Structures are given as C-alpha cells and as structure tokens.
C-alpha cells in the first residue's frame, strides 16, 4: 500500500464505431489498460480509467453510406455494441462514453476558443480536394494518390510509410475513393492550428522522457525532425462538432482534433455523474491540473503522433493541463 496514493489517469484509445469489435481491439489496447488500472487500484492509487466511442470519424460516414442510413444511427448502433461488449467482458472503465455527448462538444469548443484567444489558431484559404461527380469536398479518407516524398500510395495529408505530412494538393494521380473519379481542387476557408509554435517545447519535452519506449520516442522525434506545419482543424462536412465561430456554420471540427480531447471531456463527464461517489463536480482537476498526477495513454502505433504531438500541443496552447506521462504503444 502506498503511503501517498498517486492519481493515475488511464486513457484508452477511442475506437471508431463503424463495426463490431474483434479480438485485436480487445487484446491490443483495452486488455493491457484494464490490467494496468486494476493493478494500480490494488496498490492503493486513485485511478480514473476512461475511453469512449469515436462517433465522428469518416469510417462512420462510410459505413452509413454502405448501410443506407445516417451517420448518427450508425454511431449509436455500434456504440451500444462496443459498450455492451466491454460490460460483458467486465472491463473496469470508470466511464466509457462517446463523442456525441453535449459535454464532449462543449469541452472541445471551450479548448478551441482558448486556443483561438491565445493566438494559436489562424484562418486560411486553401485548395481542398473536391469531387465534381459527387459534388462534395473530400475528406482525407476519401482521396488516394502517390505520396510526394516516397513511392507509396497513400490517403489524406500524411503518409504512413515515410511519416511525412503534406497538403492533399501535393499528392499525384489523385482519385476519389467514393466514386473513382478524378479529384479537382476548390478554394475554401479553414481554421488552422499553428503547430510550428509548439515545436521547441515539444522537442524538449519528448527528449526528457527517458523511460518512454524507444519506438514511441523515436517516431515522435522523427515527426518533429520533419518540421511541424500548420494543420487544418476544420473540414467541409456536416457530421461532427460544430465550429464555435461565425462564418463556419457549414463546417465541422476535424475529428483528429476533437477525438483526442475526449480523455478530458470523459473525465469531466465522470466527475459530474452519479458514479463519482465523492460528488465533487470539479474532482477531475485532481487528475488534469495537479502536476503530481500521471497520465498513461494506451494506443496503437498509428496513433502515436496524435498523443505525443497533437494532444500535447492542444493542452499546452489552451491551458495548464497535465501532459502525458507515458504513451503505451
């Protein structure tokens, strides 16, 4: 038993709810996280274990098209499947929630506004992929082309093979994966997160993590070595969290930005729920604002930069929130 219990936040990757869970989902992130959380409870630490369903990702809209229904119906249908599965397997989540809650939307918009007030957001016009055939702007998963930096075929604005970021317009031989048509580009305005302003702080912070797994640390430093670029955090879509500024009513916040905020929004939701036996509505701050607390993120390897680069930048830019203690991937 520890003389002084530690506050341990266990953050488990949020799955896209576009289908049923399989053994890989359970064994990959969730089982190790559950074992870890149970161990820390056994030795007397104050553990908060949270996760939830990522309801706003493109895979959800793709599945909705396949089933000839709405993204909301798909998101709710498979959220229940995932939630019920975790209950049946007796996982010890303090809260398994979803990104469709009002609390999550409010938390995301609050951090968006804080970043904006602190000067870390910027409006830009850019050329974005568009399908004339389907008469719609195309999100990352809907375009495929040749990487401008290596021979690979890739989707979106980042190559998984070489790890480099780029603008979609830099891809060669582009096609729409929706209708297999040639992709054109149209000018549209978006809000960008000024990631280069966090480069120095992130580099120093990551290098200080002497206990991180080498794969996690090396991939993160490699990401930084390529040089951070401004990243759009809004998209021309109608499914997701609304952008809290005028002139963006027809756009939504990009899922990679809002999903990683889910760990914070879930902590706040839990604190306000009947499951919080202390009934202190602000008890979430003991995990998020107390510098002695430790955050552990259980992720797949493809999610490393979102939790070592993107999330820390958001947390640094919007307030004095605790950064990840360890990213387990």
Regions found by a protein language model. Give the residues of each.
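N-terminal, positively charged nucleic-acid-binding surface of large information/translation enzymes
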Residues: 2-205
């Amino acid at each position: 038993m520890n003389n002084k219990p530690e506050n341990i936040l266990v953050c488990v990757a949020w799955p896209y709810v576009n289908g049923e869970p399989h053994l890989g989902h359970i064994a990959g992130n969730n089982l190790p996280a559950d074992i870890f959380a149970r161990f820390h409870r056994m030795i007397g630490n104050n553990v908060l274990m949270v996760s939830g369903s990522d309801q706003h990702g493109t895979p959800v809209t793709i599945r909705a098209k396949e089933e000839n229904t709405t993204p909301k119906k798909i998101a709710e249908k498979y959220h229940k499947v995932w939630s019920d599965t975790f209950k049946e397997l007796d996982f010890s989540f303090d809260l398994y929630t979803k990104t469709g809650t009002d609390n999550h939307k409010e938390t995301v918009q609050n951090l968006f506004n804080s970043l904006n007030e602190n000067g870390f957001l910027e409006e830009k016009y850019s050329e974005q992929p568009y399908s004339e055939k389907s008469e719609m702007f195309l999100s990352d998963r809907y375009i495929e082309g040749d990487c401008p930096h290596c021979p690979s075929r890739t989707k979106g604005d980042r190559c998984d093979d070489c790890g480099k970021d780029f603008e979609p317009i830099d891809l060669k031989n582009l096609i729409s994966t929706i209708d297999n048509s040639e992709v054109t580009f149209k000018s549209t305005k978006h809000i960008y997160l000024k990631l280069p302003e966090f480069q120095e702080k992130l580099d120093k912070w990551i290098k200080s993590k002497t206990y991180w797994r080498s794969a996690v640390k090396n991939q993160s430093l490699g990401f930084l070595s390529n040089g951070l670029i401004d990243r759009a955090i809004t998209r021309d879509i109608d499914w997701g969290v609304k952008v809290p500024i005028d002139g963006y009513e027809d756009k939504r916040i990009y899922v990679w930005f809002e999903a990683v905020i889910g760990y914070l929004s879930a902590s706040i939701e839990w604190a306000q729920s009947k499951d919080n036996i202390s009934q202190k509505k602000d008890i979430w701050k003991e995990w998020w604002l107390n510098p002695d607390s430790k955050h552990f993120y259980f992720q797949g390897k493809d999610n490393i930069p979102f939790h070592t680069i993107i999330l820390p930048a958001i947390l640094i830019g919007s307030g004095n929130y605790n950064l990840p203690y360890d990213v387990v991937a």
